Amino acid sequence: GGRARMSAQCPVGLVGLPGAGKSKVGRLLAERLCVDHIDTDALVVEREGRPIADIFATDGEAAFRVMETEAVADALTHDAVVSLGGGAAATPAVRELLSGHTVVYIDAPHEELVRRTASKTHRPLLADDPSGTLARLRTEREPHYRSVATIVVESGSGPVDDVVTAIAQQLEHA
């Protein structure tokens, strides 16, 4: 069947703002393509044995970005769907790693991101002013997402399955 052709497209990177659904879409897309799903944030946590918030607090953001870049480099050697942390694409070394790969930017409307992240308390960057922070992050990061993306999909208020289907269809025709 089409499985070999699909996995030939891998790795596939997923980028987007917090709340875009990178992890959920990544998991479902990987299932659909019959490949592994790798979350670079989870990879860093596993390697370091502590939460990202701790790494930020103790070692600082720059140190975390180095760990993250290593995790991305490793993840991209696998036949997998790779969900990248929200800030990863802002790191030049990560953008370099992604060039030549299939990368999907999951673009969600501002209100949708605010709604999705409001219920989640584990996002240290969004604690005080989620809406303002997300707006600032979009301004900072969107140009990077668009520069690495080979596919852009919208993730609105509809079912996440629609997003997965849209990506799978574009991968087939890529």
Which residues are covered by each model-predicted region?
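P-loop (Walker A) phosphate-binding loop of NTP-binding proteins
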Residues: L17
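Conserved lysine of the Walker
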Residues: K22
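Hydrophobic positions on the alpha1 helix immediately C-terminal to the Walker A/P-loop
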Residues: V25
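ATP-dependent small-molecule kinase phosphotransfer cores
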Residues: D39-L97, H122-R123, S131, A135, ...
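Short glycine-rich anion-binding loops that position phosphate/pyrophosphate groups of nucleotides
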Residues: G86-A89, P109-E111, G158
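A glycine- and Lys/Arg-enriched "phosphate-lid" helix/loop adjacent to the NTP-binding pocket
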Residues: G100-H144
